[in-house]
């Protein structure tokens, strides 16, 4: 990014406010703040969020993201946070996700077993929409001319059918060189059970001087389509993520750890080799902090709702099928049309955020999202000529008060927002910009509600016993309506809600995961125990020797009845009762269990978790800042008429204070709408806990 865009960013950085510390140079004679010891950075499509420990204080702020040069916003943020070479930086981002979504990756050549070159197109032969007369197919990441077959073959059990010769390896290397690849993916049939062929071939291909991704090293599991598709996606992302991470590492702004999709972190070198494990790093980071906020307020289970500028991420936390840490996990999922067979936190994402564009389609129907105005030009209220968005609708309705966003990083132009809603109202025949804005909010909240139902009711979890934890810049604006629709008893708006994913990245700790397909009878305890011990050794070897005694190990098994096509994940230990746990899980999921059927363990997984060690926070006095004795009054549109509502700055609200709706609470980087009939109480943890009144 250069020219005017860089200038706008610099101005925004100059305007940003940081909670808890003055980051400007200290005056003559004053003692400057020390460098930040730990920093969490989460880069989204619209904003880059930062939480740092500096001088015993926790500081938090937002900056506009720079999508054309994503490292720029991260480095600006670290400079503002006072990071130096000794600072530990935990970073989650959407760089890998966006590269896959936009298909802006490397020129990849795939090498697989001869006769299986079309596995990426054949897939599972499943139609995502069985009623589509002309179903749309997503093109594979590698075209047919760069999918090459190698003359070798293994049987399903690992026996050699056709041996891979040195002559064949030399021929494959020559053919691959002719395709001029920027990255290479290698995935041979059944190599998970006998990896020698694939390892030899991948080793020879590395002589070409480009990154080589091997399926047997990345995901040594059954299911060739998913395994090879994951490997291709990894190769597709390696050059871009390698350059991005090198830029960060060369900046001298800290010792980086990269947040992965399972919620832990990895060093940059490993993250650059396996970028496919980062595809959900941003959403994953916030879940741990969200669950901690819920438990601090007395709730063991929670629905998380992270509403940012581009998308909404939600998950059910502390449910029946979560791990020992209360976080929902799954082995694989589809990202941007590509199956990814890697451990992830189970986050559901929809294209509905503050920047979601509102428009009327050719049939006269109001559509909101999934397209987003992003950071540039952004919503109309940014004053850059952007389209009408959800944020503009909330500005017109008065739910977003004040004259700036993101803690002062962006000036708010209400006239531009109203003009955009007026144009939309004409297209909708809505009569007024306020009525158009109400329609936009109803549509986007319907999509958010459907997403919350998918991860709760449709997954066998009852939301009525859980709290709704809302975060992100816009999560608090939709909280009351969504909680009421789901019959939930409380909403939790955590401290630093606007940057909770950055806080989650900072607090995430280190995690390593290893898995292996075994296809063993559940009664074969000796073979299962041996495989688990091997995986435990692999996981522990990735931690420093001094850390290994503090690592918490988790063992899981993917199990099925013999003959089934899909598995359920259960705790692996104790092995003697593994089959019993599977039958209980099967009956809970499907309503029946055949306890006489043979039970097969398909894949074993071991995870190692090393909690983060953070500095003790020195709490600031509540009276540090002078605040108004009473709230401001802002104009709003409520129940079809104009009204004036109280607007509170969050710092005005001391513990145990109560605010009754309708009201607006503004924090640096986030806004909370307290609906009529709801009341908010300030919890000792700093969170605001909302509950419906008797009249709601």
Predicted regions, residues:
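N-terminal glycine/serine-rich phosphate-binding loop of ATP-dependent small-molecule kinases
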Residues: 1-108, 155, 162, 166-185, ...
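Active-site phosphate-binding/coordination module
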Residues: 106-158, 215-219, 504
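ATP-dependent carbohydrate kinase catalytic cores
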Residues: 71, 77, 215-223, 227, ...
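Terminal amphipathic helices with adjacent charged low-complexity linkers/tails
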Residues: 191-230, 606-622
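Gly-rich Lys/Arg/Thr-decorated short loops/hinges at beta-loop-alpha junctions or inter-strand turns
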Residues: 52-59, 128-131, 140-160, 224-232, ...
């Amino acid at each position: 990014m250069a020219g005017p865009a860089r200038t706008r960013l610099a101005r925004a950085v100059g305007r940003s406010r940081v909670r808890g510390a003055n980051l400007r140079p200290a005056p003559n004679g004053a003692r400057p703040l020390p460098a930040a010891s730990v920093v969490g950075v989460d880069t989204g499509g619209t904003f880059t969020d930062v939480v740092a420990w500096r001088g015993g204080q926790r500081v938090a702020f937002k900056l506009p993201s720079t999508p054309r040069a994503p490292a720029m916003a991260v480095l600006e943020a670290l400079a503002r946070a006072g990071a130096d070479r000794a600072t530990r930086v935990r970073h989650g981002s959407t760089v890998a996700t966006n590269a896959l979504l936009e298909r802006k990756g490397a020129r990849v050549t795939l090498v697989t077993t001869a006769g299986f070159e079309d596995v990426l197109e054949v897939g599972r032969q499943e139609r995502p929409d069985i009623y589509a007369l002309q179903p749309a197919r997503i093109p594979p990441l590698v075209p047919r001319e760069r999918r090459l077959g190698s003359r070798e073959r293994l049987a399903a059990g690992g026996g050699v059918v056709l041996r891979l010769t040195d002559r064949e390896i030399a021929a494959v290397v020559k053919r691959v060189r002719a395709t001029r690849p920027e990255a290479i993916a290698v995935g041979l049939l059944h190599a998970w059970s006998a990896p020698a062929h694939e390892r030899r071939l991948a080793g020879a291909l590395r002589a070409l001087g480009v990154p080589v991704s091997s399926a047997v090293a990345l995901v040594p599991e059954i299911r060739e389509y998913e395994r090879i598709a994951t490997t291709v996606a990894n190769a597709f992302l390696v050059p871009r993520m390698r350059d991005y991470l090198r830029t960060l590492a060369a900046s001298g702004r800290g010792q980086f750890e990269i947040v992965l999709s399972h919620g832990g972190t990895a060093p940059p070198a490993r993250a650059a080799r396996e970028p496919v494990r980062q595809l959900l790093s941003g959403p994953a980071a916030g879940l741990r902090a969200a669950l901690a906020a819920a438990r601090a307020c007395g709730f063991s289970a929670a629905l998380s709702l992270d509403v940012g500028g581009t998308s909404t991420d939600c998950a059910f936390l502390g449910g029946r099928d979560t791990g020992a840490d209360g976080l929902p996990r799954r082995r694989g999922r589809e990202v941007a049309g590509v199956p990814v067979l890697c451990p992830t936190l189970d986050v559901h994402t929809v294209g509905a955020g503050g920047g979601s564009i509102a428009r009327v389609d050719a049939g006269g129907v109001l559509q909101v999202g999934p397209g987003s105005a992003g950071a540039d030009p952004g919503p109309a209220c940014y004053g850059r000529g952007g389209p009408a968005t959800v944020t503009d609708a909330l500005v017109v309705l008065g739910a977003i008060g004040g004259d700036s966003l993101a803690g002062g990083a962006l000036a708010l132009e209400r006239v531009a927002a109203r003009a955009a809603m007026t144009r939309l109202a004409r297209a909708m025949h809505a009569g007024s910009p306020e009525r158009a804005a109400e329609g936009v909010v109803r549509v986007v909240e319907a999509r958010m509600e459907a997403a919350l139902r998918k991860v709760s009711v449709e997954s066998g979890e009852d939301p009525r016993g859980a709290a709704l934890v809302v975060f992100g810049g816009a999560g608090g604006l939709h909280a009351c309506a969504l909680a009421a629709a789901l019959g939930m008893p409380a909403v939790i708006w955590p401290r630093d809600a606007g940057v909770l994913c950055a806080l989650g990245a900072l607090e995430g700790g280190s995690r390593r995961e290893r898995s292996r397909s075994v296809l063993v009878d559940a009664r074969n305890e000796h073979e299962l125990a041996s495989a688990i011990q091997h995986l435990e050794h692999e996981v522990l070897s990735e931690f420093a020797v001094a850390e290994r005694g503090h690592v918490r190990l988790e063992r899981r098994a993917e199990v099925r009845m013999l003959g089934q096509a899909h598995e359920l994940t259960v705790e692996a230990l104790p092995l003697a009762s593994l089959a019993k746990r599977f039958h209980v899980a099967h009956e809970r999921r499907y309503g029946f269990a055949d306890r006489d059927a043979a039970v097969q363990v398909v894949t074993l997984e071991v995870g190692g978790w090393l909690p983060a060690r953070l500095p003790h926070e020195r709490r600031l006095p509540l009276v540090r800042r002078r605040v108004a004795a009473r709230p401001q009054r802002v104009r709003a549109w409520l129940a079809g008429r104009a009204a004036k509502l109280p607007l509170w700055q969050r710092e005005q609200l001391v513990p145990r204070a109560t605010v009754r709706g309708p009201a607006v609470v503004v924090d640096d980087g986030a806004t909370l709408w307290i609906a009529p009939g709801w009341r908010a109480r300030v919890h000792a943890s700093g969170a605001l806990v909302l509950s419906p009144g008797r009249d709601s």
